[in-house]
């Protein structure tokens, strides 16, 4: 209904306040959404609020609650966000006080594996989806976070040998290789 749309638009506008430090519990969420599609959108907004608040468990629970929603966009975006949420959980635990990467020893393996599984599931279901390119790049980050330099080197070789990227993007990729991979693993040097 038009009332549902208005309520959901308002709720979406409230979401940016999370980035300004507002707590999820302080947001006035609509309470009278009348249809299942609208409820799925509301749950997506709430899950995203938890994601941006770094409440990984609640975000995961909420995204999974709507992963089979009737709306095709909700199904696709939640499939992607389940992986992104697990990646952020893993990444944040490995950051130091000043945002520096503390190293592979600080990586939690379970969310890393769950993120990998979620992104691969997303890509098998939506190989040309709206978030396919991002999911592919985030899988590359997961390979790096796992410490698999040989796997990362194979992925970089695959990317450099494809026509997926324009030349300008390959320059950025070469810089990434310099930062993440060098020195080369002994088996590849």
Region spans (language model):
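Acidic, polar-rich low-complexity tracts and alpha-helical solenoid repeat scaffolds
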Residues: 1-189
């Amino acid at each position: 209904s038009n009332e549902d749309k208005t309520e959901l638009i308002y709720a979406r506008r409230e979401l940016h306040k999370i980035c300004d430090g507002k707590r999820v519990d302080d947001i006035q969420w609509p309470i009278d959404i009348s249809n299942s599609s609208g409820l799925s959108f509301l749950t997506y907004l709430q899950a995203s609020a938890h994601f941006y608040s770094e409440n990984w468990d609640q975000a995961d629970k909420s995204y999974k609650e709507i992963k089979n929603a009737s709306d095709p966009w909700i199904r696709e975006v939640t499939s992607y966000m389940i992986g992104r949420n697990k990646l952020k959980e893993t990444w944040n635990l490995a950051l130091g006080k000043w945002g520096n990467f503390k190293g592979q020893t600080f990586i939690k393996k379970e969310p890393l594996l769950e993120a990998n599984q979620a992104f691969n599931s997303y890509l098998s279901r939506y190989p040309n989806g709206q978030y396919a390119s991002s999911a592919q790049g985030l899988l590359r980050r997961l390979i790096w976070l796992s410490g698999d330099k040989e796997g990362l080197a194979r992925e970089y070789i695959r990317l450099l040998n494809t026509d997926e990227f324009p030349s300008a993007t390959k320059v950025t990729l070469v810089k990434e290789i310099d930062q993440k991979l060098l020195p080369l693993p002994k088996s590849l040097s």
